[in-house]
Every structure is written in structure tokens, then in C-alpha cells.
Amino acid sequence: MPSTFDSKLFLKTVSSSPGVYRMYDEEGTVIYVGKAKDLKKRLSSYFRVNLPNVKTQALVSHIANIDVTVTHSETDALILENDYIKQYMPRYNVLLRDDKSYPYILLSDHKHPRLAYHRGPKRDKGSYFGPYPNGGAVRESLHLLQKIFPIRQCDDLYYKSRSRPCLQYQIGRCSAPCVNKVSDEEYAVQVKLASLFLKGKDLQVMTELVSKMEASALALEYEQAASYRDQIAALRRVAEQQEVSNTSGDMDVIGAYYASGVACFHLLFIREGKIFGSRSYYPSVPAETELDEVLSAFMIQFYLNSDSQRTVPKEILLSHGFDDLPELERAIQTALEKKVEIKTNVRSERANFLRLAVTNATNAVNTRLSHKNTVEQRFLLLEEALEVSTLIQRMECFDISHTMGESTVASCVVFDREGPNKADYRRYNINGITPGDDYAAMKQAITRRFDKIDKNGKIPDLLFIDGGTGQLRIAQKIVDEKFVDIDKTPMLIGVAKGEGRKPGLETLIYGENEQSFTIPADSGALHLIQHIRDESHRFAITGHRNKRQKTRNTSTLESIAGVGPKRRKALLQYLGGIQEVKGASVAELAKVPGISLEMAQTIHDSLRG
């Protein structure tokens, strides 16, 4: 492999998101295009010591550069990969392989058929619709079908055990054939219509529903006619949404992201509804420039550049608005002598395209901020600003996150001279403190981090505390205690938010003497501090949200001895939810499959306290 390509450095900048990668040779020719569910995992596999086959060895030996485009889903990655393969015809692309089975929607062959998610061998009798690109697409379709056709989606065990309608019947998403709330004939009609809809025969479904509504009205069956009317309305809403989401025509989609002095504009070029290509632009941004000014300057220079010979589409989607946008739109129309619309508030597929562009812009900025040369330069500037005599090799930053004291989590992120060192990131679940006590939370986190530290451990040269003097003082006290017998001691610095929490106005505080100081807003040293502070905040809040969601999702049934996952599922499905389980009598609990009278009594007593 050419020495100009550093795979280790490159892999540190790659995320674990789904996406597409393009490999180039020394002449800049695309030699391979691939997709991955996890870009980091897939790309890492190319640079193992023992590669699996000769083709891969030959491919890797010609790699001079790799370009990555993040997508929101594997489906987006697949579409973009196909487009790139058609465009570049790379010599190492032979075929597209996917060893995973594709999911389907199953319309079962029962007296009262059900709609269900299916993946794997088609052993069950019934009609299969698909394949769908992924499980999410199937679940979204099933959710949509529930709104239009009141067909059951429950499994057979749940269906056979019902003695009363479930919640789906009460909200109008199932006709409850399990307890004879609908005739077999009418249920069969709905099954037929759902089957036609899944085959794409929307017009035929609409025609039949209108015919049945009119027939019911003539027969004075007004309630049934009203039901058909509601179905027609739901079907029309879906048709309208599909018309918007099936995007056609040409668009430029621009996602912007600006952080720590680096701006990126990621453009998706949509032609005839497909992603034709993408490109990132990095304008040079003077210090303390507002985002509005960056946006305006880029749009003007990009679209009013007569030398570029670019074809400007009639529709431009932009992730952020700014004050001069209407004027810019008029200027472009005047220069091009045609109508051009710049939109910032869009929905459906257009919104998905915008999110995709912003994701790629964000990823590009983070990659730039993580780049070795950029980080190295900022480390040097930080050493100069702090007037330290030795190199800063390792920095750590702590932050606390909670919601009104709930599910408190502390984060510790680590930067070295190549940027974020995610392998050393740590989260600490904070317990045993007064809810909302950030000082106690910080004390616990710092104590746990350095509890068994010795001279051979990973000792940071700099330790940043995201907070004011109070939290910094506690952290300094813990560090002084833990490092009493160790020669090397980290320098502590507090990062206090500035007025209005605006970046560039932060106040820095030395932990040793609590003296405050500032660094110019346009300094790379401050940008480095902002980067590690923001990363610590992101890592803390992500952990907090996950912990909070897990806590809130934990059913009270889990605390009852003898009630495992299968029994919990049976109880919740049979009775319709946790509130119904709590309100059930011992006799009602005992009717649930797998629940004995003795177990029913235990559950009843436990829930009633």
C-alpha cells in the first residue's frame, strides 16, 4: 500500500454509522465503491494483517485515499452505492452481495388472517409481500396498514387467549375478530383490500371502498357507511404523503455545520429523485464570524459564480435560514434568468435528504477537528497559552448530566495529540447522592477515576472540569489526595460558561490557585478546549438519556420473583398493559397462560403492596 495513505490515522476519523466509501488510487481514479452498516468496522477489516483473499490484497495495495459518505440507513447506503458504481464503474466492483435474508410482510392463511413481520424461510402459509429493504421499513408499513385496515397483527397465542377486546380495538386499529366484534364476511373484505393495497393497487382499493360506502348508505346502514368514509379519508392521506415522499426532479440539498472555527457545507446533488453525488466544501472562516454570515457568503459565492458552469436546479434545500435569504433568492433568479426556490422548512423525503446532508456535514467537521495536523497545531497553541514547559500528551474532561436529579451520569472523555481517543472514554453511573447535587456527583466521578491510580497508570497532563469554581475545587481536592505519593500530577482547569453560554466567552479557572483567565476567541487553543468540553457534554448527555429511558421502561413486574420475560410478556399481552395487570384480580391473573393460581396470588400481592 502506498506510504502516502495512513490507514491507522484514517480509521480514527471514521464513525460507526452506515454509509458508502469510495477508494481511490494514486491517480485519483475510483477503484472500489462499497457500503457498510458500520463504516468503521467494515473499513478496519481491509487493514488486517492477514487479508482473506488475493482480490482484497490487490485492492488494498492500490489504495491512496478513501472518501466516506455517511447515510441515515442501510437503504440509503445501498441506493448511493449503486449510483456510484454506475457512475464510476470501478474495476474492483464485480457484484453486490448481502448474505442477510430480507424481511417481508406476511398475510397469514387463517380464518382471521393477521399481518405480521417475517424474516427467514417461508414456512408459514399465507401471502408474502416484499422483500423490504430493512426491518424498519416493514414496521413502518405495518403501522400504516393499521391506520387504514382494521386487521389483527397480534400473534396466535394472544389471539386465542382473548376474552375481551384489546386496546387496538378501542383505538380503532383492529376489528377484534377474536371476540366476534366483526363478521367473517366483513373481515374478509378488509383482508382483500389490504392485500390489494400491498400489491400497489391503491386506485382499485379506493374504488371498492367508495362503492361499498355508497351501497351501505343506500341500505340505510349509516354507521357502516361512515366507517368506509373514514377508511377512504385515511387512504387519501396516505396517497398524498406518498406523492410528497416519492421525490422527483432535480434539487441541491445543502447541510451546514459550524463548530470550533471549522465550517462545512455538504451538498447532495439530487437528480430525478436520486442522489447523483455529494461533495463537502470548507470555506475559510475568520474568527468570531456568525453562522448567518458564513451561510450567506457561501451561498452567494457558490451560486453566483459564473465561471463554474454549474447547472443550478429550480429547487435548493438549505438546512438553516438566514436574514438575507429572500434577497439571495432574487439575486440568483436574476442572474440565471429562471425561477429558483430556496427552501428551509420541508417535510417527508425532502426533510430526510436535509437530515442526511447535515449528518454528513457534522461528520466532516468532526473529522476535520480530529485530524492529526489540526489537533497537533492546537495542542501547540494550548501549550503556549498555558505556558507549560512539557508536552501535553493526554487531556481529560469531566461533565455531569441529569434531568432534575434523575439518572445522573458523569462522563470522562480523552484527547491525545491525534484527537479524541474514544477507546479510553468512560461513563460513571452516579448513585447514592442527593438528586441534583452536581458537587457530590463530580466528587464521586473523580474519586472513581483516580481511586487506584499509580505512577504506571494513564495520568492526564490536563484535566478539564466543565463547571465553575465549586466543582473545580472538589475535583482539585480529590486529585491532591489521590496523587500525594505520585510525582506526576495533572493540571486542573475549570471551564465556566460565558455570558449567554456563547462560545468564545468561556472563563477558564486554574484549579491550583482558582485564578481566572481567558484565551482569545479566535485561538486554536480555545477551540481545542471547546472541542473536548463539547465532546464531554455529548458523551454525558447520551449516557444520561439512555439510562433514563432504561429506567422508565423497566416494568414493575421485573421485581417479582418467578416472573421472567415470558411470563411478563404473557401478562401484558393477555391483559392489555401494566395498568390492567395491576388492576386484575387473582382469578383474572390465573387465566393468563403460564400463570398458576399460586403465582397469580404472588403477583397480586406484590403489585398491591
Swiss-Prot record:
InterPro entries: GIY-YIG_endonuc, GIY-YIG_endonuc_sf, GIY-YIG_UvrC_Cho, Hlx-hairpin-Hlx_DNA-bd_motif, RuvA_2-like, UVR_dom, UVR_dom_sf, UvrABC_protein_C. One of its GO terms (molecular function) is DNA binding. Disulfide bonds: none annotated. It is found in: Cytoplasm. GO terms for cellular component: cytoplasm; excinuclease repair complex. PROSITE patterns: GIY_YIG, UVR, UVRC. Residues 16-94 form the GIY-YIG domain. SUPFAM superfamilies: C-terminal UvrC-binding domain of UvrB, GIY-YIG endonuclease, RuvA domain 2-like. Interacts with UvrB in an incision complex. Belongs to the UvrC family. This is UvrABC system protein C. The lineage of its organism: Bacteria, Pseudomonadati, Pseudomonadota, Gammaproteobacteria, Alteromonadales. The gene is uvrC.
